[in-house]
Amino acid sequence: MIPKIIHYCWFGRNPLPKSALRCIESWRKYFPDYEIKEWNEDNFDVEMMPFTQEAYKMRKFAFVSDVARFWILYHHGGLYFDTDVEVIRPMHDIVARGAFMGIEVECGNGLEYPYVAPGLGLGATPGMQFYRRILDHYSTQHFLDENGNQIPGTVVSHNTEVLREFGLQPHNDIQTVADITIYPIDYFNPLDDATGVLRKTQNTRSIHWYDKTWLDNYGPFRKWTTRIIHRYFGINSIAWIKHLFTK
């Protein structure tokens, strides 16, 4: 059984933004009997491995959270949400079925396997084999290369890579991998990040608002500008514009 606790991470010692507080309030609404626990520098060892140590030193706190969520759920179990996830419907049926994750990007159109994102929400019991494996995976990784530059890669790519080791199948329907139920995109990710279009269904339980706290101060402006361009001119339009002006 998944313990009745919701974990979230907030590193950097800045106050939580109003958007995060609204999301946390939605957790309280739909999980009234759950403890909600914040993890930060005071109760999580940011120097536990080179990846987290280097990310924290560079003030890339979202990448510290990428590892922390797996460590937390491996040792404690429970639910994990990023602070930009709003719960909009009851999830008790999903929690009752056991450990879960959700698809962020569907396979197809050249993508062989779906991308499964831990930022959409996680449910786990303590000591799950998958969580031990992904922690072992991260323990071999660095955040910075030998020149001090950030190494490309996201928690979604790392998560999906390890799920494939455990047998993730190339389809977008519900499947179970390593005792984890993987849910289709409409359950936890109805918002198209590229266009900002929201497509809720009767299955939708939560919305990931893509606050992108790891971006610089121009991040919100870039996010909304990019979505407008993608929505009206297509998702390949920005690449086309860049190509046009670099000929």
Predicted segments — roles?
Residues M1-S65, T83-K247:
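Glycosyltransferase-associated regions of secretory-pathway enzymes
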Residues D66-G78:
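Small-residue hinge/turn detector
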